[in-house]
Every structure is written in structure tokens, then in C-alpha cells.
């Protein structure tokens, strides 16, 4: 067997957005703006502290995506993918074929859903289905019973994160 790896893509945190009217009101010098965007309060020349939340509004939250395929059921990945916005996880077999999944180093739809549930991901996308299933909805039903926000990965599917 060859070791496989997954991928975790996570955006860097973006700086807060300056509220121009408030920066103008407090006459904040331009050289202070980067510090303020990164969370610092502003201290006026008179010594008054102006809270950062008066000068900025939060940026959109960072997004994250994890991809795990061609892998046996591996609960230890939970900590690495904790809280991702979207998880693609293989769901090669149905529960009734769990012994075959273990033998071939793959996972079942229920195992993929359990990983998603334990990792508290926002959305699960399952794929890499065995050709033995004419109707992949059986895999979707098994996964959805454990992790309701599950979707089948189909060719040309586009998912917003």
C-alpha cells in the first residue's frame, strides 16, 4: 500500500475594514491605519484611547476546505480538519460493505459522515464511489443520517464556500 495524503486549504485572516468616517472624525494619521486594521486601538495626541471596534468593522471570515480521499477510516484526522467550511471525503462503500472498505483501505459513507460530525465541519461532500452502486443515493442517505448537511459530489458540481 502507498501512503495517501489529504489537503487542507485555509485562507489567511484578512485585516479589518477601516470605517472612513470614524478615522476622519478622530483624525487618525495614515501611518496608524495598518496597525488599526490589524486590531490595535488608537491613542489620540491627547491620550484618549479609541477602541478598535469604533474604527473598524470585521472582514469576512476566512474560508477553509479539506480533501480526504483514498483513505481508510482514520479518526485521527478530526483535529486537523476541525471546523472547516467544506470537507470532501471519500465514501466508497455503504455500511453493508464495511468489511470490504477496510480490506481495500477505503471508507464507508457513514464513516465519512462520522468524521464530519466529530470534526464539526459545516458541509460534507462525499465522492469516490464504488461502481457497484447504481444509485449513489444509498450512500447519501447513510451519510445524511449521521451528518445532515451532506451532498453527493457529481461531475460539474460547483459548491460555494
Feature locations, PLM:
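Active-site-proximal loop/helix segment associated with metal-binding centers of metalloenzymes
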Residues: 1-67, 71-79, 86
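Binuclear metal-ion centers of metallo-dependent hydrolases, dominated by the metallo-beta-lactamase
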Residues: 73-161
